[in-house]
Every structure is written in C-alpha cells, then in structure tokens.
Amino acid sequence: MTTILTYPFKNLPTASKWALRFSIRPLSCSSQLRAAPAVQTKTKKTLAKPNIRNVVVVDGVRTPFLLSGTSYKDLMPHDLARAALTGLLHRTSVPKEVVDYIIFGTVIQEVKTSNVAREAALGAGFSDKTPAHTVTMACISANQAMTTGVGLIASGQCDVIVAGGVELMSDVPIRHSRKMRKLMLDLNKAKSMGQRLSLISKFRFNFLAPELPAVSEFSTSETMGHSADRLAAAFAVSRLEQDEYALRSHSLAKKAQDEGLLSDVVPFKVPGKDTVTKDNGIRPSSLEQMAKLKPAFIKPYGTVTAANSSFLTDGASAMLIMAEEKALAMGYKPKAYLRDFMYVSQDPKDQLLLGPTYATPKVLEKAGLTMNDIDAFEFHEAFSGQILANFKAMDSDWFAENYMGRKTKVGLPPLEKFNNWGGSLSLGHPFGATGCRLVMAAANRLRKEGGQYGLVAACAAGGQGHAMIVEAYPK
C-alpha cells in the first residue's frame, strides 16, 4: 500500500481537497476554556462480566512532574519510584504485607537498577518477600504495568497489585564508544603484559567519543519529532492549529492546578533541597510568543516546535489495584473499575503516532460502547500535531475504509470532554510514568464530573498504541 506520509500528501497546500477532507472544527482557545460540564447522572449499564473478577483502582499518586535538569537532576530513578510508592502508602494506608506484587514501567534504564521496581520497593520498605518486576513498552510502559496487574488479579493469581512507572531524563546513560568498550573488555581478558601493550597500541583518541542515547527509532532511524512533523503535514494540520492546541493544554493544566484538581500529585522532599509540591512545566503563553519559535525538527518549513511538543520530564507514578471483593473487605471505597483494554501496533515508519486511532474502536467494540458513551477522554499528548492528526484520522470515513479496514469512521472525541485538566504537553511526560497519570486523571474526572466511562489512549515508539476503558465506581 502506498504510504500515507508520502502520497498523495507531499507538498500538500493547506487549501487542498485533502486538507478539507481532514478539516476539523476550529480549536478556539477561549471556547475550550469554559467551565467543566455540569455534573450529569448516568444510568448506563456496568461493564462487569460474568465469572470474571472486577478489578478496581483504589487510588493513585505521582510525584510532581518536573522539567529534566531541575530539582530531580541529582537523583536516581529508584529515588523517584520510591517516592511514588511511599506517597501511595501514605495516601491509602495499605499495609505493605498485603501487597502481592509490584510492577513498574520505565524506558531508559539505569544500569545499576535495571529492575527498578524491585529496588524502589525495597527502598520504600516493602517486604523482601514481595516480588517485583519492571516492564518497558516505550510511552505505554506504565499502561503495560497496570494491565499486567489486571491480568494477575482477574486470573486469581493475586488480590493486591501496585503498578506504576518512572523516568529520569536528567541523567540518561552515556556510554563509551563501542570501540572503547571492546578495548577495555579485551584488556580485562589479557593475561600478559605483552598482550596488554599490544591492545593499548590500538587505542585511538576517537575511541573516547561518547555514545549518546539514541533519540531516533531503531527500525526507521527517524526521530519521533520528524515523524510528528510529517504526520501533521499529511493530515494538513497547520502550525496555528498546533499552537492553539498546545495553548489549550497549558491553560487547562494551569486552571486545574490552581483549582486543586490535580489531587494525584504528592509532595516530595528532594534530599538536600526544598520540598517539591507541583508540576513545573505548566507555562501558559500566547499564540504570538509561540509563533516566534523556529521549527525543532524539519527546518525551515516544519510546524513542530518546542512549544507544541511535550518536554523531557522526570517523574514517577504509582497506583493501588485490587480485586473488588478484597478492596471492600479492607474497607476501601474504590475510585474506578479497570475494564477492557487493547494494544495495537502499526507501521512505525508510516503511522508511528496513530496508536489511539487504531486502539480506540477496538476497545470500544470489545466493551460494547460507542464514542457517545464516553464521558471523559484522556489521551497522551506527545505533540499537538499528533493529537490533531489522530482527530482527523478518527473523523474520516476515507481513512477508516482505506487504512483500518472499517466501513465507518471511529468518530471525533468532543473537545469539551477531552483532556480537560491538561495533558502531556503541559503536565509533562516521564515516558515510563504517564500511563498511570492518564488513568488517574480519567478516574478523578469521572468522580468530579459525574460521568461513568472514561477512555484512555496513547501512542508509543515502535508504532504501538494502547486504549483502556475506565468505569467510575458507584458513589
């Protein structure tokens, strides 16, 4: 099949028929900052399934999400993960000994703590008899941690799971070059002075050039920013639309922060520094200021900039998941049910960031729901262009038929229900921790707004995606 990003969209003018095909209603910032919808009474059926245990979220917390290179810069990942676990223990008062298993997601691993879930659990005082493992699935690593926990509970293997994620972008592993690594390993194996001198004679100063962590996709050699730029062009998403959406995200996040709606954030006393109490990447600006920024990836004509992209972030999250009967027996009032979920993958070169478009209809069909049934949408915002391209794909019968094998489009999420408390563009995106933030935002919004169903969705590196249905627990 001809790739969507090369034909028929290259050199596409904004006023083309394709742009009209994929047009969406204007994203007026002022219209999207109105008060949240009035609390509404829902009478929809529950998604409980016969003979399958109900899995509930008791509560979840996260450290403040901070710009990398700020207050967390001297920490290690397990420090942040431990802080999230400690915050969860304080928030829920759950006895450590009842936790059956701990699962954390992370992406860029610190080699000293490759199983960061285990190290953080021990540091937080959990029993050394409590197993813990770490998963990685790019930006949906915490989602994978949660759904692994759901599977363990639903199958009867466990009753109580702690799932979460962590990322510390302030201190990523920087390696010696491969030639230098090989030389040092060979020197370590050398048995005589002659062998060592022979190896040392092969040393060259360029061996000392460091090997930085890869920022591009291994399979395509393209950065995610480049892919986002090409995707925005393919779907005729303008620079102005992207900036408007980013401004919306920051403005809504600031409003939510000021009103105390980001209740999942727990204070963290950074050793040797002050206590951090809130996210520090929320920065409402103006369209005029944002328009001054130059393209970050495809220069000089790209539309993805630092202002309409998520930023490198440090942070951790943790969530207490239980079998419903266990939670009630312990006296908890859960916040939400974790219902159906779906993982998808598609061509990483052509459709790297379209995971939500593919995952959403599958999880809705699995749950027997439609877009109209969803009261709170929480999508991961990697880039404004990524979100808006997904919107246009989801709202296109043509895309559904030609690329998804569907007869009708998925449908466009109503903006008045979408990421109402900000998103990754403004709150930050610690790769391994974002999934838990999304689920807790959906659960807390459902309680606040009186809705019943939330839809969480995210894209991920490698052309993968995830979607999950969250159902409010009856009050």
UniProtKB/Swiss-Prot annotation:
It is an enzyme of class 2 (transferase). It catalyses: an acyl-CoA + acetyl-CoA = a 3-oxoacyl-CoA + CoA; butanoyl-CoA + acetyl-CoA = 3-oxohexanoyl-CoA + CoA; hexanoyl-CoA + acetyl-CoA = 3-oxooctanoyl-CoA + CoA; octanoyl-CoA + acetyl-CoA = 3-oxodecanoyl-CoA + CoA. Residues 1-34 form a transit peptide. The modification N6-acetyllysine is found at K73, K189, K294, K299, K333, K349, K362. It is found in: Mitochondrion; Mitochondrion inner membrane; Mitochondrion outer membrane; Endoplasmic reticulum. The record marks H429 as: Increases nucleophilicity of active site Cys. Residues 174-221 dip into the membrane without crossing it. One of its GO terms (molecular function) is acetyl-CoA C-myristoyltransferase activity. Its EC number is 2.3.1.155, 2.3.1.16. Belongs to the thiolase-like superfamily. Thiolase family. Mitochondrial trifunctional enzyme catalyzes the last three of the four reactions of the mitochondrial beta-oxidation pathway. The mitochondrial beta-oxidation pathway is the major energy-producing process in tissues and is performed through four consecutive reactions breaking down fatty acids into acetyl-CoA. Among the enzymes involved in this pathway, the trifunctional enzyme exhibits specificity for long-chain fatty acids. Heterotetramer of 2 alpha/HADHA and 2 beta/HADHB subunits; forms the mitochondrial trifunctional enzyme. Also purified as higher order heterooligomers including a 4 alpha/HADHA and 4 beta/HADHB heterooligomer which physiological significance remains unclear. The mitochondrial trifunctional enzyme interacts with MTLN. Interacts with RSAD2/viperin. This is Trifunctional enzyme subunit beta, mitochondrial. The gene is HADHB.
